[in-house]
Structures are given as C-alpha cells and as structure tokens.
C-alpha cells in the first residue's frame, strides 16, 4: 500500500466499497452545479502584459457548504476502500492490478467520473474530479490507469464527439465494461506529435479508413477495447492540392487487425498496463472520425490540455500522506539523544514539503475553479503550469523524504522507494516539462505579441513619441516607482497579513510585462528558437501563478476563519518571498548582455561535448607529456 499497513480485507473492504459506491451514486443524483464566480479565463495571458486579471481569481473559487458536505460523505468511504483494499506493494511487485480490484473500481463509478450523467457517468465537475484524485493517488498505478482511460482515452469523445458517437461509446466506457486508451506516441515521434507515421487511407468505396501503423508506450494498451488513435490522412485543400494532416479516430478492438505487445517492465507505475499497439489493415468506419478529417492535431492538444491540472491535486494527496508518514518517523527516531524532528535541517525539509503541497494544491483548485465556468474556458497555460510545478515538486519532495528516512527509505519493505520510482514519470508524460515550458512561454508571448504589435513596430521604426515614452517608463522604473495593481489597500482583494507578499507579486508582474515587451522587440519571431530564454519566461510565469494562487487561497481562509489559517499565511508568505527573488534573478538574466546570463557558455560547452559524444576533459591524473 502507499504508506499504509494493510488492514483487514474481505468483508470489511467489500463493505467499504459498497458504502462508497452507494454514497457516490446518491450524491451525484441530487447534487447541484458548483457555485463559483465568473471569470474571463485570460489570467495567465494577461500576466504577459503586466496585468493581474482579478476576476475569477480573487476571491478563491469555492463550493457551497451543501456541496462540500455531500462531497465529504463519500470521500471518507472511498478513502477507506483505498486504504483497506488496495495492496500497492503487491501491485508493484506483480506488475498488474488484480482483476477484483479493477472490478471494484468499476463498481465505484471511478471509470466514468467526468462522463455526463446522461451517458451513465457521474458527471462530476473538474473541482470534484480533482478532489477524487487526491484519494486515488494513494496508488500510482491505479491513478495512471484511470487517468489514461478517462482523462485522455475517452476525453476526445466528450470534447468533440458527435451525439451518435457519445451514445454508442460512453455508456460502456463509463461503467468500465470497456476500457479506453490514447494512441499518439510512436517509435519515431515522442514530443513531436505532428511527425507520426501511422496512416489511415480512405477505402475505394469511401466507407472505411484503412489504418496501419504502430504506437508505443500506450497506457491500457493491452486492456483497452476502445482506442483514440491519431493517424496521417490525405486531405484535399481548397485549392485542390493534397497534403497529409493528422486525423483522430475512435477504433474498436473488434474492428480487427489490432495486436499489442507484452506489458513493458517499467521503473515505476509498474501495475499500469503499458505496451505497444499495432494496427494492420484495421478497417475503421468513416463515422468513427473524431472531429474533422485533418483536425486531429487540435483534438490531441485539446485532450492533453484539458486534464493536466488534476496532477496538482493528485500529487498533493500523495505528499500529504508522505508528510504524515515521514513526520511520524522523524518524531520517534532518535539520534544523538534527540528526535530527528528537533534538528534544523530536518525541519527545513518538512517546511519545503508542506510549502510545495500547499502551492500545487492551491494552483490545482484555482485552475479547476476556472475550468468549471460555463463555455469551456481556455485554461491550457494554467493547467500546464500546474503540471510542471507539481511534477517537479513531487520528485523533489519524495527525494527529501528519503533523506529524512535514511536507510529505511531505500528498503523495499517500506513504500518510500516505490513512491520515488512512481514519481519520476510525472516529469515525462502528459507532455514533458521541457515541451510544456516552451508551450507556456510561447502561448503567452504570442498573445502579448498580438496586443503589442503596433507598439513594437513603432519602436523598431524609431517613432519619436513611442521611443520617448518607453525611455520615460524605464526611467521611472529605475527610480523605484510604486506598483499598484489593486491587490492591497482599502479596496484590495488580498488580506493585509499578506500585503507584503502581494506587493512583491505586483512588482514581479509589472517588470515581467516590461521584460516581455523587450524580448519581443529584441527577438521578434525568432524567439521560438531561444529555448533558454523561453525556459526563464515560463519559470517566472509559474512562480507568478503560484504566488497568485496562495495569496487568493490564504486570504479566503482568513476571511472565513478556516482552522490553521495562520499556518497557511506562513506557507504563502514563505513561497512568495522565495518566488519573488527567483523571479528577480530570472528577469535580470533576460536583460541583454547581463553578466548573470550564461547562455552562450552553456551552448558552447554542450556543442563541444556533443561533437565528440563524450566528456572531453582530460583525466585529473593525466600529464601533458
């Protein structure tokens, strides 16, 4: 189990599962929509312009007391089921989830969490999905299996499927009778999704697409009955020319010509089914095109963008359990006649873990609150930031926990080494963090570029008025102008106890906006090639979003008198101070010719290494002659 000693099984666990299932069904039958404030869903993009869009962010999104009590009624039984019934150590050792465990997950409705109720699912909001993710995260293999099924496997049908497709496929997918998989990655195309080679050719009678190709590292690949498959198709453009474009398909295993390899032997998430899937002359009815022919790339990106936010709540759930277990050890383990918990370097690690959990949790639920607004708001940047922050924090925090535990953390008798192995994949799947950083930065810069186009053109052409205005702004900034973006003061939305942190956020946002304009002026369209610059832009933005999330959440906690809100204030202020100074350093590195910027040295070192494909320094014991 994920950090838990196995308790009694059999009747007790079955009863827990039955209670959780009953409460969940009753809850979904009588619940009402989430009540959150409306928002313009442009928060992250507005940061690139030096603005803080308060609408939908302040105050922190919340659910009603009635909804909260109903959620908590089934959270308890569900947590009890995962604690008593799921043997994570066995799943890890045997490399598979037992059939009876999968069946109980189906009976709990966990295969249809976000499938609309009219198709047999629970129809839960993004916020409630995030809340469930905290509990499900007690076992990483189950988390990945369920996420691959519904966050990406069937998500395309919900997002862009027509009514016939939804009615045909969603009921059996939501019940778990059928399991879904998402087939995009290929041997020669990982992060470069557009370079896939799998091809779908229209049959002569134009009734089928003939699908041929192979996909790799497909979660649920050996279990799935239904696949969302992406393939190249020939598309005739308006001018009559033919081009290859990606198309998405709903593919049934029963269509034939589908085989899969044996499950991969993985470092972590070992209980999830990961394998190659091969398609050989698989006949897919034209009715099973998902979206439009040639529109598959957009479908794939929308699917991936829609689910990333939930990693924040899932990792936070795992970290909370890890903190609990590690704290018990630190408070009872004695060294030098003192408990480990009394030593400053150990205390620092607990503060770090708590801070990271608080920030990612705040970011995740702020994003889910945005996503729950009507009209499918675009929160793709926010969701990507949650994924990057939470995945890297997970790896860092589990490593720190093992350091506290010493040798015990390295032993397979305990769950900690498994947690470390399970955490590593988080930085890779659902978009590598490197690719997501580029996505975060470029999407925001593209937005800013559209807004600032005329101004940048005037600066490049030497328009006197615009140039003088820019010089004046830089002069005022250099003199230490006071930045007021409306977070503090009599009409401020941040609680006074967080005022200094709010001022730091405002200052960072202001100078970030100025820096964005400078970067667009300096690099223009060529900025897409400046990956080290884009990485810093993304890192700053992630910090700004984290600062915003904790300030909004902590202010709400103070306002409504939540227990331990003073602890939240400590965590929020700690993070904001650290993020503020990190941002200042990153902003200074983005200055042209800044001494802090080592990009050219980095490129030169890597170029020399890669030319030789080796470490090229002489051995320290070598002599010149």
UniProtKB/Swiss-Prot annotation:
It comes from the Eukaryota. Its EC number is 1.3.8.-. Residues 1-41 form a transit peptide. It holds the Pfam family Acyl-CoA_dh_M. Belongs to the acyl-CoA dehydrogenase family. As part of the MCIA complex, primarily participates in the assembly of the mitochondrial complex I and therefore plays a role in oxidative phosphorylation. This moonlighting protein also has a dehydrogenase activity toward a broad range of substrates with greater specificity for long-chain unsaturated acyl-CoAs. However, in vivo, it does not seem to play a primary role in fatty acid oxidation. In addition, the function in complex I assembly is independent of the dehydrogenase activity of the protein. This is Complex I assembly factor ACAD9, mitochondrial. It comes from Mus musculus. The gene is Acad9.
């Amino acid at each position: 189990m994920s950090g838990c000693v196995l308790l009694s099984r059999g009747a007790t666990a079955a009863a827990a599962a039955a209670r959780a299932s009953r409460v969940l069904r009753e809850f979904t039958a009588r619940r009402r929509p989430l009540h959150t404030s409306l928002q313009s869903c442009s928060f992250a993009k507005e940061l690139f312009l030096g603005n803080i869009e308060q609408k939908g962010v302040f105050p922190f999104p919340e659910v009603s007391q009635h909804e909260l009590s109903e959620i908590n009624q089934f959270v308890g039984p569900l947590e009890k089921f995962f604690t008593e019934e799921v043997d994570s150590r066995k799943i890890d050792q045997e490399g598979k989830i037992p059939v009876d465990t999968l069946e109980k997950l189906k009976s709990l409705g966990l295969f249809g969490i976000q499938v609309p109720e009219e198709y047999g699912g629970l129809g839960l909001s993004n916020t409630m999905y995030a809340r469930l993710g905290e509990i499900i995260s007690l076992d990483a293999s189950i988390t990945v299996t369920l996420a691959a099924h519904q966050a990406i496997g069937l998500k395309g049908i919900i997002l862009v499927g027509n009514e016939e497709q939804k009615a045909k496929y969603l009921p059996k997918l939501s019940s778990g009778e059928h399991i879904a998989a998402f087939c995009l990655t290929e041997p020669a195309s990982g992060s470069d999704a557009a370079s896939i080679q799998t091809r779908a050719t229209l049959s002569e009678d134009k009734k089928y697409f003939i699908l041929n190709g192979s996909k790799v590292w497909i979660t649920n690949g050996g279990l799935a009955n239904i696949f969302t498959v992406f393939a190249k198709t020939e598309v005739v453009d308006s001018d009559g020319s033919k081009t290859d474009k990606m198309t998405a398909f709903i593919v049934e295993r029963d269509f034939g010509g589908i085989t899969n390899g044996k499950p991969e032997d993985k470092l972590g998430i070992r209980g999830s089914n990961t394998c190659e899937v091969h398609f050989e002359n698989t006949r897919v009815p034209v009715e099973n095109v998902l979206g439009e022919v040639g529109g598959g790339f957009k479908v794939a990106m929308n699917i991936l963008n829609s689910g990333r936010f939930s990693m924040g709540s899932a990792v936070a759930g795992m970290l909370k359990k890890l903190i609990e277990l590690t704290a018990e050890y630190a408070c009872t383990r004695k060294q030098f006649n003192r408990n480990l918990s009394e030593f400053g370097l150990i205390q620092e690690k607990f503060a770090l873990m708590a801070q990271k959990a608080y920030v990612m949790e705040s970011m995740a639920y702020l994003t889910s609150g945005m996503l729950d607004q009507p009209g499918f708001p675009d929160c793709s940047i926010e969701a990507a930031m949650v994924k990057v922050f939470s995945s890297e924090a997970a790896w860092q925090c589990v490593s720190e926990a093992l350091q506290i535990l010493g040798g015990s953390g390295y032993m397979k008798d305990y769950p900690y080494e498994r947690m470390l192995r399970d955490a590593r994949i988080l930085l890779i799947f659902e978009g590598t963090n490197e690719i997501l950083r580029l996505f975060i930065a470029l999407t925001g810069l593209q937005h800013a570029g559209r807004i600032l186009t005329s101004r940048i053109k005037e600066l490049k052409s030497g328009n006197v008025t615009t140039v003088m205005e820019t010089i004046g702004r830089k002069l005022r900034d250099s003199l230490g102008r006071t930045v007021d973006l409306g977070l503090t003061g009599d009409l401020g939305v941040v609680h006074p106890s967080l005022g200094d942190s709010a001022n730091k956020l405002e200052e960072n946002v202001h100078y970030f906006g100025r820096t964005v304009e400078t970067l667009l002026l300096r690099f223009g369209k060529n900025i897409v090639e400046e990956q080290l610059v884009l990485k810093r832009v993304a890192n700053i933005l992630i910090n700004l979003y984290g600062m915003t999330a904790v300030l909004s959440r902590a202010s709400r906690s103070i306002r409504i008198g939540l227990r331990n809100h003073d602890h939240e204030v400590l965590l929020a202020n700690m993070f904001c101070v650290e993020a503020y100074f990190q941002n200042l350093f990153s902003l200074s590195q983005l200055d042209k010719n800044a001494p802090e910027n080592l990009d050219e040295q980095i490129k030169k070192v890597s170029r020399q290494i890669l030319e030789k494909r080796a470490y090229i320094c002489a051995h320290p014991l070598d002599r010149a002659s």
